[in-house]
């Protein structure tokens, strides 16, 4: 039996508190409950993946994700990680509805295999970059003091792109944006407005117009409309002076093809938890062939769980927008041995 065959695996559920409540148009949480998955090859090499469901995937409870990962681990025993694609495709075929679990399994498998070959995931993806800068997310808080404090803290840490959650009442969204802008204006910040499916075409355009008139530089409008509203997204993409990103509506290469054909976005936001790593490359290929730009986001992964996304970003160099800040939003976490953060800067170790 080859040294790259899967020998064992472990699954564990753990909860981590957030620095501040995470609030979007879809809900609110004060902690994240993730599932860690470790896989060990016969030669002793280990790989790690982490399943973290977002508020958009609230039906995926940790116990359900853990059960799926345990099943995937059992089916992988004795299989050769040096031939990962059949295992990965089987995981997604069986558990496409539990995407974060399938993705965590895939990440652990590819992490173990590349390590066994003396490679990092970033090197396997192409080794394009050593470092890059991420944005920072500011939740849909209604407390102006909390918003101001979070924005000021992030600015002091060096962040210059602020992703602000919107999608509630227009007045509340504008008040939040103005609070952030007032706190960081001297830095000439850029803004990403994340609607989390909570806006309409008209309200999105009014929000963008108000932000422009207030002097804000809006770089991107992320998934403002419901994920099934391709027609509305196409209209908004056509009418908006700001690039529009598809997030929740793209989980697979087929979804990306539909976005391209219906001209439903000018940017596609890839998340490893939605698509895994190999399908992320396929989605990127579709977007790049159609001259769409790419964003790479995350759920609520720890630093270790975010490692595959960091390596995907830096290894490929494909992404115009990086939203890899989940580790920075946690109250406490252990740094990953495979990358490090200095404020917005993420870099390989």
Question: Locations of the language-model features?
Answer:
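Metal- or metallocofactor-binding catalytic centers and their adjacent structured scaffolds
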Residues: 3-6, 10, 40-116
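Flexible C-terminal active-site loop/helix
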Residues: 4-18, 34, 262, 299-349
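Short, structured patches in soluble enzyme cores that scaffold and shape functional sites
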Residues: 13, 136-140, 165-168, 195
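Short Gly/Pro-enriched turn/cap motifs at secondary-structure boundaries
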Residues: 25-30
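N-terminal small/glycine-rich loop or linker at the start of catalytic domains
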Residues: 115-140
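Short, charged beta->alpha transition segments
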Residues: 119-124, 144-152
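Catalytic domains of carbohydrate-active enzymes, especially glycoside hydrolases
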Residues: 153-165
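Catalytic core of soluble alpha/beta enzymes
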Residues: 164-307, 330-342
